[in-house]
Amino acid sequence: MIRGRVWKFGDNISTDHIAPGRYFHLRNNLEELAKHVLEDAMEDFAKKVQKGDIIVAGKNFGLGSSREHAARIIKIAGVSCIVAKSFARIFYRNAINVGLPVIELKEVDEINQGDELEIDLENGVLKNLTTGKEYRFTPIPKFLLEILKEDGIVNYLKKHGSFPKV
C-alpha cells in the first residue's frame, strides 16, 4: 500500500523537464541531480517534495530521450509513485526498472494538488482520502510487482538470478 500527498503536473512532462539538460554534467551524481528534479515544470518541487509524496500528471509523462536517470532521480527525491493519464513507454519501463511504481488512470483531472492518496497496486485501487472518491486501474502485472518489491530490476536479479516468470 502506498500513501502520500499529491504534486500535480500537466500533460507532456518530458525527460528534459524531469532532468534539465543544463545539469547533464551531474548525471553521474544522481543525489545532486535529484536536487533539480522537475524544476523546469515546478520551480521549487525538489526543495518541497517529501518522502512518500505522489506525482499526478496528465498525458504522455516522461516523453523525450531515454534517460534512465530521469525516473531514478524522481525516486531519489522521495516520490513513492507516479499516476498519469499515460506514460511514454520507455519512461514507464525505466521507472519499473528502478523500482518506481507507475499507474495509468484516466481520471487524474479529478485529483488536486495536495490531496492525500492511498494506492493498492496489487488490486488496482486508488483512494483519494481527501475527497473520499475511489478509482480503479488495471493492476500492475505480478511479474512487474515482483520487480517493484525488490526495489528495481537490478536488485531483483541480484536476489533471484533471473527475470521473473511471466
From Swiss-Prot:
Database matches in InterPro entries: Aconitase/3IPM_dehydase_swvl, AconitaseA/IPMdHydase_ssu_swvl, IPMI_Swivel, LeuD, LeuD_type2/HacB/DmdB
EC number, as in UniProt: 4.2.1.33
Keywords, in A-Z order: Amino-acid biosynthesis, Branched-chain amino acid biosynthesis, Leucine biosynthesis, Lyase
Disulphide bridges, residue numbers: none
GO biological process, one term: L-leucine biosynthetic process
Classification via Pfam families: Aconitase_C
Keyword Amino-acid biosynthesis among UniProt keywords: yes
Any one Gene Ontology molecular-function term assigned to this protein's record: 3-isopropylmalate dehydratase activity
Pathway(s) this gene product operates in, as recorded in its UniProt entry: Amino-acid biosynthesis; L-leucine biosynthesis; L-leucine from 3-methyl-2-oxobutanoate: step 2/4
Reactions mediated catalytically: (2R,3S)-3-isopropylmalate = (2S)-2-isopropylmalate
HAMAP family for this protein: LeuD_type2
Its job: Catalyzes the isomerization between 2-isopropylmalate and 3-isopropylmalate, via the formation of 2-isopropylmaleate.
Subunit structure: Heterodimer of LeuC and LeuD.
Similarity comment: Belongs to the LeuD family. LeuD type 2 subfamily.
Protein name: 3-isopropylmalate dehydratase small subunit 1
Gene: leuD1
